[in-house]
């Protein structure tokens, strides 16, 4: 049964975190989680994931306090799993299964019974929970214990997330913390997650850029420039509140600028009057007869009066300027990018990519999707694949399919990964030489700056040209010298894309594997704008429907699930 809004289940007061080098992550954050589902949003690098780690207890704050309601379950972005981690490890039943195996082999020691306790059907219960979550291997498995022995390395990214999340929920936590839980999930898995969030008996705090998920939350916490703010309602309600604020802020800024201009005019007018009065006074004194003392006193009095007038006008102008600057800080920066990439242009008839998609007659090579299995991303079931796929000119193709259908494997095979090519169900017959590829897991030198990386990718550009291009991608001033290792996940993605787009020779085919994973809403908008400037062919794997809807796709290819 869904929970209702109540007293805070998780709260924190005056929370601060200072990194070892003295850099503050944030200071004096105070807030609470009491709604059924609360979203934590903010720009990349604002500290969202760090705040979750503090609340989960995996990171200690520099100062401040956290009140936790018993057990806090935490699902990090990268899951923190090794390829050898088993499903049994996720459910913490490995020891129980080992004891059951030993017992069945003829070892009847008392210690084994103690290890098993009341958990004789632990594997079956875990399988049932996974099946209820739409975990495909659980639906197909006939041996629960064999399923539990499967390693994470044999699962797709979405299957691993589903298994880890299901295991967390099975612990019945007091609060559930999720960091980008829908990354790598196909449409069916996302729908299952949404249903799960609607029925959880504990409050959830989730970091996500998934627009569909954000529309289902009950409260939004925004972490921006070290300040945490709360908004009642879903993401649309939050955006409406922010838009109203920005309209008011723009109006207040116009008014402040008008007042500042008026104060400047009045200051100039006052100075003009004072100058005229001073000249008139000097002329009068030159024509007046009297003691030097009396004339000096009169001049001194006039100077004091002028100084007082100047001080009054300057004070009013300073106050108006301070107000104008404060109003400017209330305006959120325009994050529009301006990029010209003529080198990526591809002639309409030029062959860019060629794939063989239908091979043999076995079940694994069937060109049709299963009748009972709806394809990922809303594609119709049983859609036939063409025998060959040829991408020509600046076409934009989305590669869709359920988790485990081999999308990422196909991309790696296209890029020449021999191991992926051996396991892929499809063959890459041709790929244009100038191809840029961004995999799900980026590998960038942590000690190099974005300026160094882009200059290495394009030695024909001067440092100033690179800085100009990076500025158009919103990397400005001294930020271009920061080492990649200190950047957020979203910023690292932007650096990786910059090195690809600005490379020499320019890419005529751009391949992106789940590019919006780990990106905040502003960075997703940034990516959409960057791709609008790109004039080559595009091949993208993404479960982000809102993102794909804005790419100007020319076709969608849905891969069947291979069992």
What are these regions (language model features)?
Residues 165, 193, 497-499, 516, ...:
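Hydrophobic anchor residue at the start of the ABC signature
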Residues 16-17, 23-33, 66, 386-392, ...:
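Conserved A-loop
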Residues 157-177, 415-416, 491-511:
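GG-anchored amphipathic helix commonly corresponding to the ABC/SMC/Rad50 NBD signature/C-loop
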Residues 81-154, 439-499, 503-508, 514, ...:
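ABC-family P-loop ATPase nucleotide-binding domains
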Residues 37-38, 50-113, 393-465, 543, ...:
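ABC ATPase nucleotide-binding domain signature region
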Residues 322-368, 373-442, 458-460:
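Flexible loop/N-cap segments at domain edges
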Residues 176-180, 185, 509-514, 519-520:
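Catalytic Walker B motif of ABC-type/P-loop ATPase nucleotide-binding domains
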Residues 2-15, 96-151, 157, 244-360, ...:
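Coupling and communication elements adjacent to P-loop NTPase active sites across diverse families
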């Amino acid at each position: 049964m869904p929970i209702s809004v109540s007293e805070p289940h998780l709260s924190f007061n005056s929370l601060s975190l200072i990194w070892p080098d003295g850099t503050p992550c944030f200071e004096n954050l105070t807030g609470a989680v009491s709604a059924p589902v609360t979203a934590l949003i903010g720009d990349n690098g604002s500290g969202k994931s760090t705040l979750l780690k503090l609340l989960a207890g995996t990171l200690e704050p520099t100062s401040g306090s956290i009140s936790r309601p018993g057990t806090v379950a935490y699902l990090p972005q990268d899951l923190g799993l090794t390829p050898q981690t088993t499903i049994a490890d996720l459910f913490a039943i490995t020891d129980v299964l080992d004891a059951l195996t030993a017992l069945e082999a003829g070892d009847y020691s008392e210690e084994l019974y103690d290890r098993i306790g009341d958990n004789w059907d632990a594997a079956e219960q875990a399988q049932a929970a996974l099946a209820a979550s739409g975990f495909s291997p659980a639906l197909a498995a006939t041996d629960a214990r064999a399923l539990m022995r499967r390693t994470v390395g044999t699962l797709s990214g979405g299957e691993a997330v589903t298994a880890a999340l299901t295991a967390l929920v099975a612990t019945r936590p007091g609060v559930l913390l999720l960091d980008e839980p829908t990354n790598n999930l196909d449409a069916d898995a996302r729908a299952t997650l949404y249903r799960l969030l609607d029925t959880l008996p504990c409050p959830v705090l989730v970091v996500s850029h998934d627009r569909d998920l954000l529309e289902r939350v009950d409260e939004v916490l925004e972490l921006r420039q070290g300040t945490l703010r709360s908004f009642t309602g879903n993401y649309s309600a939050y955006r409406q509140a922010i838009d109203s604020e920005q309209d008011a802020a723009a109006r207040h800024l116009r008014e402040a600028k008008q007042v500042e201009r008026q104060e400047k005019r009045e200051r100039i007018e006052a100075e003009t009057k004072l100058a005229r009065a001073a000249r008139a006074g000097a002329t009068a004194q030159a024509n007046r007869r009297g003691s030097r003392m009396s004339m000096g006193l009169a001049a001194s009095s006039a100077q004091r009066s002028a100084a007082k007038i100047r001080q009054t006008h300057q004070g009013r102008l300073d106050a108006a300027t301070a107000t104008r600057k404060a109003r400017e800080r209330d305006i959120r920066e325009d994050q529009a990018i301006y990029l010209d990439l003529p080198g990526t242009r591809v002639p309409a008839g030029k062959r860019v990519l060629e794939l063989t998609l239908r091979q043999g007659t076995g079940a694994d090579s069937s060109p049709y999707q299963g009748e009972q299995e709806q394809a990922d991303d809303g594609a119709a079931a049983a859609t036939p694949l063409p025998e060959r796929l040829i991408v020509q000119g600046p076409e934009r193709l989305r590669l869709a399919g359920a988790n485990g259908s081999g999308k990422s494997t196909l991309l790696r095979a296209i890029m020449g990964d021999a191991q992926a090519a051996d396991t892929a169900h499809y063959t890459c017959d041709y790929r244009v030489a100038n191809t840029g590829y961004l995999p799900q897991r980026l590998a960038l030198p942590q000690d190099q700056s974005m300026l160094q990386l882009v200059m290495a990718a394009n030695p024909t550009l001067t440092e100033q040209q690179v800085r100009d291009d990076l500025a158009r991608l919103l990397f400005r001033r001294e930020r271009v010298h920061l080492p990649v290792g200190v950047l957020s996940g979203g910023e690292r993605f932007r650096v990786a894309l910059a090195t690809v787009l600005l490379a020499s020779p320019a890419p005529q085919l751009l391949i992106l594997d789940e590019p919006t994973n780990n990106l905040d809403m502003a960075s997703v908008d940034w990516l959409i704008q960057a791709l609008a400037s790109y004039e080559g062919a595009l091949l993208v794997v993404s479960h982000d429907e809102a993102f794909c809807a804005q790419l100007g796709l020319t076709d969608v290819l849905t891969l069947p699930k291979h069992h």
